[in-house]
Amino acid sequence: MRLIVHNMLSCNIKGVVNKFPLRIEAEKVTVKEVDFNPDFLRYMFAKIDWKALVDGARSMEYTELPDNAPDTTTLESDETFLRKFHHALLELHLEEGSLVCPETGRKFSVSKGIPNMLLHEDEV
């Protein structure tokens, strides 16, 4: 599971208010190379929750992203930053581990890179 996917997932348990971001508990992380596309990264930047991305990357042992989101000038001119953003967003893969609801602590397993977000009957 890539961090771009993680950034769009939330806990859907009935009655839960604090659904996002899911905390990552990584057991196995891999890196899979993806073609670098600066235009795609600039487009996606506005759609990404920066703090969730940084926290997710750090939980996967990647610490190259700044705490605060950069400004648009950086996006246009700093290829080094774009490559770090690209690596975190698209190349880091959570292969095995869990996603944890911030409110309930419910763990959703990730196996072979696929998050299991199915709920139990009492959670629907």
Curated annotation (Swiss-Prot):
Family per similarity comment: Belongs to the TRM112 family.
Organismal lineage: Eukaryota, Viridiplantae, Streptophyta, Embryophyta, Tracheophyta
Residue ranges of the TM segments: none
Its biological purpose: Acts as an activator of both rRNA/tRNA and protein methyltransferases. Required for TRM9 tRNA methyltransferase activity.
Gene from which this protein is expressed: TRM112B
Subunit text: Interacts with TRM9.
GO molecular function ontology, one term from the record: protein heterodimerization activity
InterPro entries reported for this sequence: Trm112, Trm112-like
Tissue: Expressed in anthers.
Designated name of the protein: Multifunctional methyltransferase subunit TRM112 homolog B
Pfam families according to UniProt: Trm112p
Cited SUPFAM superfamilies: Trm112p-like
Residue pairs linked by disulfide bridges in the UniProt entry: none
Domain TRM112, first and last residues per copy: 2-120
